């Protein structure tokens, strides 16, 4: 009886971990759709990331802002 209960608990734990990993895998894709516009706050290491044609300038942390590319 203890073995059956242990197996059930173990199965639930494994299922929970698998679902958490699946959800975590979708977060970067969702975050990639959103971008920060010119003069908005950004963070290259964690997001929000700057829109295309902009880069994240951190002249004074934590005041990082999206600036236009100069090239």
Swiss-Prot record:
Residues 1-20 form the signal peptide. The modification Serine amide is found at residue 70. GO terms for molecular function: sodium channel regulator activity; toxin activity. The keyword Membrane does not apply. It comes from the Eukaryota. Expressed by the venom gland. Keywords: Amidation, Disulfide bond, Ion channel impairing toxin, Knottin, Neurotoxin, Secreted, Signal, Toxin, Voltage-gated sodium channel impairing toxin. Its main location: secreted. Disulfide bonds join 35-51, 42-56, 50-66, 58-64. GO terms for cellular component: extracellular region. It is found in: Secreted. Residues 21-33 form a propeptide. The keyword Nucleotide-binding does not apply. Belongs to the neurotoxin 07 (Beta/delta-agtx) family. 01 (aga-2) subfamily. Insecticidal neurotoxin that modulates the insect Nav channel (DmNaV1/tipE (para/tipE)) in a unique manner, with both the activation and inactivation processes being affected. The voltage dependence of activation is shifted toward more hyperpolarized potentials (analogous to site 4 toxins) and a non-inactivating persistent sodium current is induced (site 3-like action). Interestingly, both effects take place in a voltage-dependent manner, producing a bell-shaped curve between -80 and 0 mV. Negative results: does not affect mammalian sodium channels (Nav). The presence of a 'disulfide through disulfide knot' structurally defines this protein as a knottin. This is U3-agatoxin-Ao1a. The lineage of its organism: Eukaryota, Metazoa, Ecdysozoa, Arthropoda, Chelicerata.
């Amino acid at each position: 009886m203890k073995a059956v209960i242990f197996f059930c608990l173990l199965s639930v734990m494994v299922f929970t971990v698998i679902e958490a990993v699946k959800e975590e895998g979708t977060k970067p894709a969702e975050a990639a759709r959103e971008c920060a516009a010119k003069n908005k706050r950004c963070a290259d290491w964690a997001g929000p990331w700057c829109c295309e044609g902009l880069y994240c300038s951190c002249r004074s942390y934590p005041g990082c802002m999206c600036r236009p590319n100069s090239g």
